[in-house]
Structure formats: structure tokens, C-alpha cells
């Protein structure tokens, strides 16, 4: 059981790939490490295709074990449960660059499982998992046209940094992950602090160049430890069936793709499919309807692509650089804190912003510990948005991924906690969809945040772009439709302000997309983004000066950190009483910052006054309003300044001789007292003498009793 090990330097880190010792019944297994962050990746591939299988069933699962960080899971069951949002996003990150590298017609089931088994807090496991998956697939012998490399690129002090540590990443204006083969970039996922298109493209090129060392070392690793390549041959096309389908459907499909309205076009195409299937299966019952649909889909692609390359109008009649008609409404929901309805052609997003307090922040339990997130973004894609029925429930992988992309687009313009002490949640409800719903969510979110009075640094817009390439000729499409997304060779999404890019996502399906092509595409995307921003600025030019009447007002005050315990009180009694009496929410930071959230300004004012009383220092000779809390034989205890207790001795109630304290004072009675002395132990001595004019304390009590009667 001697493992085969490959070790190499990758930037400032050391990468180790090991196989042959663990999980020997899997098709391939690799233990991938980068500076003590270790991910165990397995690949299992079925030798036989499932009966009736007509698509490529690739599954990628990524899971983090808490033992990797020396921790025991929380919760009742004390074990890992369903994948977290972070795990889902990393699974997608692995899936996206490897999926296009399997040949067309390969339908064998493959499962990739990446398990984090050791974690160095300075090294993110996502990159290690991508490298491990590339190595395992390359070793497995399946028809995988890899390997791929992966790189994270940061931008610190105007310099690109390869695979920055988590500490370095906090200083970076860019978090970009790029994956590709030795010849081409396949995937980009990034967020940026408003960088130019030129800087983003340079980062992609830098990352692709640097990851070549990974690809070369995986190739050497495969020579030493790889399994024999599968003897898989692509199925021969059924030319007879193709010609029959072509004769029946091609001309009709050409006419259908001149229908600009999506639903009408889809109805026509569905009718053509049903008709062709009925005719051909009537002639020969052995013909699979799935095969017929595949041929029709290929014909659709050919028709649309050839028209685009020939310079003809697109499916909906637009030119290549035209953005669909925009319609924007803000403040569409009367009781929400901020809302906007953003419509671009047949894609529509209803975005809603909600303001909350510190206690509404999301606590994320990561491998390296808990962290708090003050900006939440949720994307919902209900089936009615595309005119279908379907299951409603927890978000799917796609919804999680689109929500994170939209969040990345907006994050760079969000105010800091000091500038705006609210937790903010944005929800994007996709109510119609025909391409680019994630970028509609970016636009809708920007509008809803401004409607809510969130002081974002600038408006943000997003645009989805496509590319069709045939040999040396290529066409870049602005604001792609759903059909153009499926039929194109590259789709990429860019979000940003007038000053620069905040998020970039690319998925490339073919080789030959050069940096020059990417540059042209990014510049065309910039023009589309500026157009959308212009329309958005007409709808709402700046964030509203006031937040909604229905949103909590957060009032901030500062107290001495040593006094925090006084405000909280024994067992939280004081702060609990304050919140219950006033209907407010109170949060206190360790530095003494107190945040009071209330929809009623008067309630917030009362709380601030009470807190000021609680933290105020008692001064000798000062006169205070107080409340009698206890009556004893030798005097009475009086609460002043929100809970500080002092003693009025029996001799200090009045100048007259007092036989019984109860004759003069009772529990709950409001009195005025003067501080005589603060003893070394902190005990406060009070007096009531000469504080009620000429009347004695006894007379005051009698007057109160008479009024009560």
C-alpha cells in the first residue's frame, strides 16, 4: 500500500497530490493538500450507461468535516447535516469548469466527492478541492479532456497576488477564481471593489498563466499513477434519422425562430416537436422520441447561430448590442422598507430591501469559527416565472449561486456599519424570466436599496452577455435571452457602477476564446451597463434621504464600557425591563456603543434618557428624583439615577423627630433627595431635609394621602 506522491510549488504555497493508499475501490482518489489544508477527492464512474439515459449525469458534492478544524459540530445531533450555502457554492465552482470537458454523447454516470479533512485557517479549501478534482478525474481514465488548473487572484497595492492567504485577502480589492486548461480559460468567478474592465481582464490572464504549473504537474502525476484510458468511442450519428427530422422540421423551425414573443415561439416549437415525433414513431416504433428531440435541439442551435454569424437580427429582432426595453418602478410595496420592480424585456425582478438590527445579522458557522454577515441577499426563482408548474421549497443550487452572484455585484457599494448601523436583507423574486435574471436582481437590488434610504456609494447595474464563434468569426451579444444562453459558446455576466466592475462571472464552452475577444466583449458589456444605469438614475437618482416610516430607527450613543454591566443589570433584568417598557430593541457592543432600534422616536428618546441616568456618576450635594424601594426601622432605601440605591437615615427624613419611618415614607413613593456622602465602599448616604420648602415630610405624605382619597 505504497502511495504515489507528487509535490510542487505553486506561488508561495506547496501543493501535494497523493493517491493509491485510501479509497482504493473508487475509480480514482486523490488526497490534495496545500499548506496543511487537505481535501480528499474521489471519483466513481459507471462503466455502463443507464438504460434510456440521454444526458450526462455528473454530480459534484463538496463537504466540510468539522474535525478538519479540530471542532465538534453544534446542534442536538452533533454531526454534519445538509450542505451549507458555502458548500453548495464550492460544489458549483468545481462542477462548472469540468463539465464542458466531457465529450458530447458521453452519458456514463460520474460522481465527484470532495471532503475537507484538514484545514489551515490561512488557506481556503475551495482551490485545493478544484485541483484535487482535476487530478482525480485525470487519473480515473474516463474520457475527460483535462486536466484543469485553478487560481485565486487578489489585487493588493495595485499588484496582482497569486493565491493570497485569508489574511492577505482582507486587504485585497479583488477576489477572483479562474479555472482553465493549458489552452483556454473555462470559468471565472469574482467580486471586486470597483476595478476597471482592463484590470479584470488582466487578472484573468494572470491567473490562467500562473495555473499552468498545476496542469503540468497533474499531467506528470497521471503518467506515473493514472489508470488506462477508457476505450470509449462517441456513438455514430444516425444520419438517416437526422435527414428525416431535418426534412420535416428545419423549415418550420426557421419560421418559428422569427416569432419574437417567447411563449408564442415555444408553443410553435413544441407543436413542431410533437408533430415530428408522431410522424416518425408511426413509421418506426423503435425510434426514441428523446433522439428526435436531441436532433431538433441541434437544428435549433444551428439556425440561431448561423443567423447571428450572418449578421441577421436576433431571435427577438434586436441587433447584437441592443438592450431590451426597460421599465422601472420604485416603492411598489407600501409597507416594506424599500422595493422596486425591474423589467427588462421578458425578464422581471421584484426586489425588496428590509432593514434590521444587529441581532438580525446571520451567524455563519464556518470551519474556522463563527462569523457574522450584515448583508443578506436571497434570490427566488418560482416555476411560474417561466410559465411552468413545479416544487416550492428550500432553494436549489442554482438559486443559491445566482443569489451569491447578485450579492457580489452589490457588496462593493454597501455602506459600512459605522456609516449605516443596520443589517440589510434584499430578496429578489423573479416574476418573469427570459435570460439574465441574476443581473436583473442586481439592478432591482440597487433600486430597492436606494428606495429604502440605504446610502449606497453608487447605483449598480448588471448585464448578461453571450458570444457565438464559428472558426475565425465571432459575434458578441448584449443582454442575452434564455435561448441565446443555451446556444452560445460563452456567457458572462458583468455587474458594476459607472466607475468600474463589482462582479464578473464567465463560463466558456469552447477553446479559442482569446484575451482580445474577452476584451471586446467586456467593452461591449460596459456600454450596455452605462445605458441601464442611465435609465435607473432617471427612476431614482440618489438614495432617499429618510428611511421608511415602517423601518426601525437606530439611535446610537456611547457609554463607558465599564458601565455596560449596569445597563444590562443582574441577569439582564435592567435591559429586559427597558425593552419591554418601551418596545425597543437594544444592542450593546463591547466598546460601549449602544444601538437603540425603535419605530417610535419618543420611545428611543426615553431609553436614551434612562441609560444616561444609569451610567451617570452620582455627585455629592446633587439633588435627584428618587423612588422609595424599601422601608426599614432605621430609614428608607431610595433608588436614584436608574437603579443606584442610597439610604435616607431616619434622622435625615425631616427636621422633626421621626418615631416610625412608615409614617413618613412608603414603598413606591417618589421623593427628592440630596447626596450627602459617597462612602469608600460605594454606599450612598442621602437626605430629604429642606427639599420640600417649609413643609415637613410628614405634611407632604398627608397631602398625598388626601389627594389619593
UniProtKB/Swiss-Prot annotation:
Keywords in alphabetical order: Cytoplasm, Magnesium, Metal-binding, Nucleotidyltransferase, RNA-binding, Transferase
Cofactor(s) essential for the protein: Mg(2+)
UniProt-annotated location(s): Cytoplasm
GO MF, one annotated term: 3'-5'-RNA exonuclease activity
GO CC term (a single one): cytosol
E.C. designation(s): 2.7.7.8
Source organism, top-level taxon: Bacteria
Cross-referenced PANTHER family: POLYRIBONUCLEOTIDE NUCLEOTIDYLTRANSFERASE, POLYRIBONUCLEOTIDE NUCLEOTIDYLTRANSFERASE 1, MITOCHONDRIAL
Name the record gives this protein: Polyribonucleotide nucleotidyltransferase
Record organism: Glaesserella parasuis serovar 5 (strain SH0165) (Haemophilus parasuis)
Gene name per UniProt: pnp
Amino acid at each position: 500500500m505504497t502511495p504515489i506522491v507528487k509535490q510542487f510549488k505553486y506561488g508561495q504555497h506547496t501543493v501535494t497530490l497523493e493517491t493509491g493508499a485510501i479509497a482504493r475501490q473508487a475509480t480514482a482518489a486523490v488526497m490534495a493538500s496545500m499548506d496543511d489544508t487537505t481535501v480528499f477527492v474521489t471519483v466513481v464512474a459507471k462503466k455502463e450507461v443507464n438504460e434510456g439515459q440521454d444526458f450526462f449525469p455528473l454530480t459534484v458534492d463538496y463537504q466540510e468535516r468539522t474535525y478538519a478544524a479540530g471542532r465538534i459540530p453544534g446542534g442536538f445531533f452533533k454531526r454534519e447535516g445538509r450542505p451549507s450555502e458555502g458548500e453548495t457554492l464550492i460544489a458549483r465552482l468545481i462542477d462548472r469548469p469540468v463539465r464542458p470537458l466531457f465529450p458530447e454523447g458521453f452519458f456514463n454516470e460520474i460522481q465527484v466527492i470532495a471532503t475537507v479533512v484538514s484545514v489551515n485557517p490561512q488557506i481556503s479549501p475551495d482551490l485545493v478541492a478544484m485541483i484535487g478534482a482535476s487530478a482525480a478525474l485525470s487519473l480515473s481514465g474516463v474520457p475527460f479532456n483535462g486536466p484543469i488548473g485553478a487560481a485565486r487572484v487578489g489585487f493588493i497595492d495595485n499588484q496582482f497576488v497569486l493565491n493570497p492567504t485569508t489574511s492577505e485577502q482582507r486587504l485585497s480589492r479583488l477576489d477572483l477564481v479562474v479555472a482553465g486548461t493549458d489552452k483556454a480559460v473555462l470559468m471565472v468567478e469574482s467580486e471586486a471593489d470597483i476595478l476597471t474592465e482592463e484590470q479584470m481582464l488582466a487578472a484573468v490572464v494572470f491567473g490562467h498563466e500562473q495555473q499552468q504549473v498545476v496542469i503540468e504537474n497533474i499531467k506528470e502525476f497521471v503518467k506515473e499513477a493514472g489508470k488506462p484510458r477508457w476505450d470509449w468511442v462517441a456513438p455514430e450519428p444516425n444520419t438517416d434519422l437526422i435527414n428525416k427530422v431535418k426534412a420535416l422540421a428545419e423549415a418550420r423551425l426557421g419560421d418559428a425562430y422569427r416569432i419574437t414573443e417567447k411563449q408564442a415561439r415555444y408553443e410553435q416549437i413544441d407543436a413542431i416537436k410533437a408533430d415530428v415525433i408522431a410522424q416518425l414513431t408511426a413509421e418506426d416504433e423503435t425510434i426514441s422520441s428523446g433522439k428526435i428531440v436531441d436532433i431538433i435541439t441541434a437544428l435549433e442551435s444551428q439556425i440561431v447561430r448561423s443567423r447571428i454569424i450572418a449578421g441577421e437580427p436576433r431571435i427577438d429582432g434586436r441587433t447584437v448590442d441592443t438592450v431590451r426595453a426597460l421599465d422601472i418602478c420604485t416603492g411598489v410595496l407600501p409597507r416594506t422598507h424599500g422595493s422596486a420592480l425591474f423589467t427588462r424585456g421578458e425578464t422581471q425582478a421584484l426586489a425588496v430591501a428590509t432593514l434590521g438590527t444587529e441581532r438580525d445579522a446571520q451567524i455563519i458557522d464556518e470551519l474556522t469559527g463563527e462569523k457574522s454577515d450584515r448583508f443578506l441577499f436571497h434570490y427566488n426563482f418560482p416555476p411560474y416565472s417561466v410559465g411552468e408548474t413545479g416544487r416550492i421549497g428550500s432553494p436549489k443550487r442554482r438559486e443559491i449561486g445566482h443569489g451569491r452572484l447578485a450579492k457580489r455585484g452589490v457588496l462593493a457599494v454597501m455602506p459600512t456599519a459605522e456609516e449605516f448601523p443596520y443589517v440589510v436583507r434584499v430578496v429578489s423574486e423573479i416574476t418573469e424570466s427570459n435570460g439574465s435574471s441574476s443581473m436583473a436582481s442586481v439592478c432591482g437590488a440597487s433600486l430597492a436599496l436606494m428606495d429604502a434610504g440605504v446610502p449606497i456609494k453608487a447605483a449598480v447595474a448588471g448585464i448578461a452577455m453571450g458570444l457565438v464563434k464559428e472558426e475565425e468569426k465571432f459575434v458578441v451579444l448584449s443582454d442575452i435571452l434564455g435561448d441565446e444562453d443555451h446556444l452560445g459558446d460563452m456567457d458572462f455576466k458583468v455587474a458594476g457602477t459607472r466607475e468600474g466592475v463589482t462582479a464578473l462571472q464567465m463560463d466558456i464552452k469552447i477553446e479559442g476564446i482569446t484575451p482580445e475577444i474577452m476584451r471586446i466583449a467586456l467593452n461591449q458589456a460596459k456600454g450596455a451597463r452605462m445605458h441601464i444605469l442611465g435609465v435607473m438614475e432617471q427612476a431614482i437618482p440618489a438614495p432617499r434621504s429618510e428611511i421608511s416610516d415602517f423601518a426601525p430607527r437606530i439611535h446610537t450613543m456611547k457609554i463607558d464600557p465599564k458601565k455596560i454591566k449596569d445597563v444590562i443589570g443582574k441577569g439582564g433584568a435592567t435591559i429586559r425591563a427597558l425593552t419591554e417598557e418601551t418596545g425597543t430593541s437594544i444592542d450593546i457592543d463591547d466598546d460601549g456603543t449602544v444601538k437603540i432600534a425603535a419605530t417610535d422616536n419618543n420611545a428611543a428618546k426615553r431609553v436614551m434618557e434612562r441609560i444616561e441616568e444609569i451610567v451617570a456618576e452620582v455627585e455629592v450635594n446633587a439633588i435627584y428624583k428618587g423612588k422609595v424601594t424599601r422601608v426599614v426601622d432605621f430609614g428608607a432605601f431610595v433608588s436614584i439615577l436608574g437603579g443606584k440605591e442610597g439610604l435616607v437615615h431616619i434622622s435625615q427624613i425631616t427636621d422633626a423627630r421621626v418615631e416610625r419611618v412608615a409614617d413618613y415614607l412608603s414603598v413606591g413613593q417618589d421623593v427628592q433627595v440630596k447626596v450627602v456622602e459617597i462612602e469608600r465602599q460605594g454606599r450612598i448616604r442621602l437626605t430629604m431635609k429642606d427639599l420640600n420648602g417649609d413643609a415637613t415630610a410628614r405634611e407632604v405624605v398627608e397631602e398625598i394621602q388626601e389627594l389619593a382619597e
